Amino acid sequence: MLNKYTFIFEIGWRDSKTGRLKPYEYRKKTQMSINDARVYARRLANTQNVLHVRFYKEMY
């Protein structure tokens, strides 16, 4: 069985009209393996107007 963790994803967006950076968006996902988190981050990074995606493993 794979270990499951809680990850926090930081997403940097660009406004499509002005080209300016929007405030970062944070998403919290639970019960994900490290590989699942990488796939999710890659999928987010391929979204239009996304500049970067960082993810952190939540520590208790």
Which stretches of residues belong to each language-model region?
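Short, mixed-charge low-complexity intrinsically disordered segments
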Residues: 42-60
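A short, exposed loop/beta-hairpin motif centered on an aromatic-Gly-Thr core
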Residues: 19-36
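Short linear motifs centered on Gly/Pro in flexible linkers and helix caps
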Residues: 11, 32, 42-45
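Short N-terminal "domain-start" leader segments
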Residues: 1-15, 55
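Generic short amphipathic/hydrophobic targeting helices enriched at N-termini
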Residues: 4-7, 30, 46-49
